[in-house]
Design a protein with these regions (language model features):
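Cysteine-dependent PTP/DSP-like catalytic domain, specifically the C-terminal lobe
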Residues: 219-236
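Core catalytic lobe of class I
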Residues: 2-222
Length: 236
């Protein structure tokens, strides 16, 4: 196993590619996974693929669509191997407008049991093309094994305002993983294979749970490590 970039009593961060690191983790060793992968939204310039400015750094966020689908399916298959028999994957993604059409993240699921789709109501959005209505929601796909149980009072529409993380252009509010992890009854180790600035890991710490994060960009590994080193509750 590679050496952790950061490790404390409850959290571990690995710097590297998720598809290289996850196979080194033991099967059925993770309680819940909450993750939000890159959306593949970079724009091509000439003949070169581009990355989001100051964004995913090491990751090319404009892959050919079939390659992106295959990549995400492989990620989810590896996530499925890692979760316990009463575990689940919370996979945050969104429908995306492509010309006159919309693509759904359902195609990213390689046939795993999709228990439910949670609607993340962001409260606002942005659209200027005159073709599509303003998008104000995203998805959290709950992919769960048979024995995974949830809180009986949590609904499937979560009204959570987005935050502006100065450290990462594609962050999500900490309330999102907090709500998901608390909705699931499995309190085992939490994994985020796209850890970014460490929001999921920090949520796990605030819930007094162990966590593992994998991040390809060393800059964000350092930011996540600093967040985890804080002793006070993190509010995003």
């Amino acid at each position: 196993m590679i050496k952790p970039y950061y490790q404390d009593e409850h959290a571990t961060i690995y710097h590297g590619d998720s598809l290289e690191i996850m196979p080194q983790l033991a099967p059925a060793s993770i309680g819940q996974i909450f993750t939000s992968p890159p959306y593949n939204k970079g724009q091509p310039v000439g003949n070169e693929w581009t990355r989001l400015d100051n964004g995913y750094g090491e990751h090319n966020d404009n892959m050919a669509h079939p390659d992106y689908v295959a990549w995400q399916q492989n990620i989810l298959l590896e996530c499925w191997r890692l979760i316990e028999e009463n575990g689940a994957i919370w996979y945050q993604h969104k429908p995306q407008s492509k010309g006159q059409n919309v693509t759904l993240p359902l195609e990213l699921n390689p046939g795993l049991p999709l228990r439910q789709i949670v609607i993340w109501d962001r409260g606002s959005g942005f659209q200027r093309d005159g073709v599509h209505l303003v998008p104000t929601y995203e998805w959290v796909m709950l992919i769960a094994k048979n024995d995974f149980k949830v809180d009986r009072t949590t609904t499937d529409v979560w009204k959570i305002l987005p935050n502006k993380d100065p450290h990462h252009p594609a962050s999500f509010p900490i309330e999102l993983p907090l709500k998901a992890l608390q909705a699931g009854q499995n309190t085992g180790t939490v994994l985020d294979p796209f850890a970014g600035s460490g929001t999921t890991l920090r949520a796990a710490k605030d819930l007094n749970r162990n966590s593992i994060g994998i991040e390809i960009d060393k800059k964000y590994c350092e930011i996540a490590a600093n967040r985890l080193a804080q002793e006070v509750l993190d509010f995003g």
